[in-house]
């Protein structure tokens, strides 16, 4: 199992996987283009539905995925045209559904205090408020941002 996890880490550069009990439910790579956010949302929502998550989980997972994928597209590459794709992984860890995005930026994600009239700057606040837990990890090729939802009883 350790060899599989090491191979996954080397291939994706993502480090969230630390528990051998973790089950990968799906993976998807998307280019750094805003039009791909909808595809990422549907991908995560469909997995949540297929795996019979709790009632509101598919919609919440869809919203939070939209936020972290949008952040990866907007902030995740110096030059989106030449950047590697954004890697999205959906995992199950016990009762938790974990969604992770990996991008090529080393920029540390920060929760901002957006003005009431601002049209952006609330994404990570939404992730923090609606998820069971969230965070980010640096990796050799950039960083990963992840969130967890309590998805199964």
Describe each model-derived feature in a short phrase.
Residues 27-39:
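STAS-typified acidic loop motif
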Residues 1-27, 73-153:
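Conserved beta-strand-loop-beta-strand hairpin that lines the nucleotide-binding pocket
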Residues 42-66:
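Conserved short strand/loop->alpha-helix "switch" segment adjacent to the catalytic nucleotide/phosphoryl-transfer site
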Residues 60-78:
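Histidine-centered phosphotransfer motif of kinases
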């Amino acid at each position: 199992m350790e060899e599989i996890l090491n191979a996954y880490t080397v291939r994706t550069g993502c480090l969230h996987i630390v528990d051998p009990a973790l089950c990968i439910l799906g993976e998807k790579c998307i280019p750094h283009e805003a039009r791909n956010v909808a595809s990422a949302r549907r991908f995560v929502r469909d997995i949540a539905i297929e795996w019979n998550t709790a009632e509101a989980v598919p919609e919440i997972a869809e919203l939070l995925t939209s936020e972290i994928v949008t952040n990866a597209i907007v902030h995740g590459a110096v030059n989106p045209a030449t950047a590697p794709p954004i890697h999205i992984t959906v995992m199950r860890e016990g009762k938790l559904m974990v969604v992770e995005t990996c991008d090529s930026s080393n920029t540390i994600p920060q929760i901002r205090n957006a003005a009431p009239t601002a049209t952006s700057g609330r994404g990570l606040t939404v992730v923090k408020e609606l998820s069971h837990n969230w965070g980010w990890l640096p990796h050799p090729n950039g960083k990963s941002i992840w969130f967890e939802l309590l998805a199964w009883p």
